[in-house]
UniProtKB/Swiss-Prot annotation:
One of its GO terms (biological process) is nucleotide metabolic process. One of its GO terms (molecular function) is nucleotide binding. It is found in: Cytoplasm. This is Putative cytosolic 5'-nucleotidase 3. Its EC number is 3.1.3.5. It catalyses: a ribonucleoside 5'-phosphate + H2O = a ribonucleoside + phosphate. The lineage of its organism: Eukaryota, Metazoa, Ecdysozoa, Nematoda, Chromadorea. Its main location: cytoplasm. Belongs to the pyrimidine 5'-nucleotidase family. The active site is at D119, D121.
Amino acid sequence: MSNKVARRLGKCLFVSGRRFESRQSILQLRTETLTDTPLSATLDQSQFSMFKAAEIVNAAAACAEAECIEQLKKTDVVPLLMNYLLGEEQILVADPTAVAAKLRKMVVGGAGKTVVISDFDYTLSRFANEQGERLSTTHGVFDDNVMRLKPELGQKFVDLKNKYYPIEFSPNLTMEEKIPHMEKWWGTSHSLIVNEKFSKNTIEDFVRQSRIVFKDGAEDFIEALDAHNIPLVIFSAGIGNIIEYFLQQKLGAIPRNTHFISNMILFDEDDNACAFSEPLIHTFCKNSSVIQKETSFFHDIAGRVNVILLGDSMGDIHMDVGVERDGPTLKVGYYNGSLDDTAALQHYEEVYDIVLIHDPTLNVAQKIVDIINSSH
């Protein structure tokens, strides 16, 4: 890691709404602890000794809306989570005060007011394996398997990626300039799949042999959301069938709280691919414009005013747009790029509330859900 990034990741502490530059400056607060909080099992025990209960409650009361104060007095675990976030070198929080305010509202609202909207590729799935080798996306499942079975067709998928991938991430093009290229890339790729008439069984087998890997803790995270009846909306510009088959193979079944907004392969009566769902969803149109208003999605998230958004690209930051609500959106972004690209890293800090650098886990998302559940 560069020194510049390391300096920006300084180990600050967040206690009672204030930011401390070193652990020494809060030693005077070590009079009472919060060891009865449900998060005690997941946070370092030494952190609990750094908090004065009265200080935390008073700060929470000052910042919270009047009707929330009594609930916050019972337990306020937000400072504990903030201290964890700000103490980890691989986590960036540009505006701790704003993040703490969003977390407090979510804690008060509880699980019944929460919905998780998440990307899949490189968000719920890992970007690289332990050896640093890049893993597959849902579209990449076809790239890998078709190249093995039908090299000529496989090369067409590779050629498309080589042509359009640099355009997708070009810093010299606006999003509006990129969109026609993304539509062409996705449309051509989908046509290749349909024209080959891949069977459902073949695609399921592709998934079994794929290089898609869950992030560490992903299975527990998804199961925890289901257990607490928190809807999980997987919003992907990839191929939704691949995600469904992957979840079925890893979890045994699709959890009842899980919804998919993605490009779905349609099959004919012989279970062969015959078309893709409309409208086409690419990287830069992941918002309400591609959601059918009559779907169960809108019914199931009615009243879910607090959104936890998980993504890994600029195209993911608007996944909550169009969802009717008046609560906060906490945006958590996975940064998989180079640490030397400080401009890109800074951009992530500007659009995501919390930035996780090269994080192969869902630990932060799990901790957020834990504190929401712990207060009710």
